Design a protein with these regions (language model features):
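Short conserved segments within the C-terminal catalytic ATPase subdomain
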Residues: 26-35
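Short helix-loop "hinge" at the ATP-lid/N-box region of the Bergerat-fold HATPase_c
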Residues: 60-61
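Short beta-strand/loop element within the Bergerat-fold HATPase_c
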Residues: 67-79
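Acidic ATP/Mg2+-coordinating residue in the GHKL
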Residues: 87
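Short conserved segment of the HATPase_c
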Residues: 92-106
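Short alpha-helical Gxxx[C/S/T] motif in the catalytic ATP-binding
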Residues: 116, 121, 125
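Conserved glycine-rich
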Residues: 133-134
Length: 155
């Protein structure tokens, strides 16, 4: 991905609400509650940041338990945005927590038909965070769920 991030002011709370609206049919089908907390402002490409957050949220919905929840929280501290995408799914095994950001990688290839996609979502998340001077990682994962953390420069 060679595109340079555009310099647009991005307010994250309305963007997250839009993502939740787009994911509502999938979430409702599985009884997943969507929750947002906090807000922040950054400079970058609104289309790319939307794609990054959408991919994280969509995975959190798709790989969740029935009647689970997805929470996106945003905190702005000094010159950094701290974004957490937390779900109540079954977690990501420790040995795969770095590999999941590689293109076409899947933790469980046998489930790819069930969930769709080709395994590019998290590699795009990694690239988009990097294009904006940030980073993404699995902060926590257990049988109670997973938390992805993203840090990006704030406005």
């Amino acid at each position: 991905m060679q595109q340079v991030a555009r310099n647009e002011q991005i307010q994250l709370a309305p963007m997250i609400e839009e993502i939740f609206t787009d994911l509502a049919p999938l979430a409702e089908k599985n009884g997943i509650a969507l929750e947002r907390e906090g807000d922040g402002v950054m400079i970058g490409s609104d289309a790319l940041i939307y794609r990054m957050l959408f991919n994280l949220a969509e995975n959190a919905v798709k790989y969740n338990r029935p009647d689970g929840s997805v929470r996106i929280s945003v905190a702005q501290e000094d010159k950094m945005l701290h974004i957490r995408v937390a779900d109540t799914g079954s977690g990501i095994p420790e040995e795969f927590r770095r590999s999941i950001f590689q293109p076409f990688f899947r933790v469980d290839k046998s489930r790819s038909r069930e969930y769709g996609g080709v395994g590019l979502g998290l590699s795009l998340v990694w690239e988009i965070a990097g294009l904006h001077g940030g980073s993404v990682w699995v902060e926590e994962s257990s049988e109670r769920g997973t938390v992805f953390a993203v840090e990006l420069p704030a406005q």
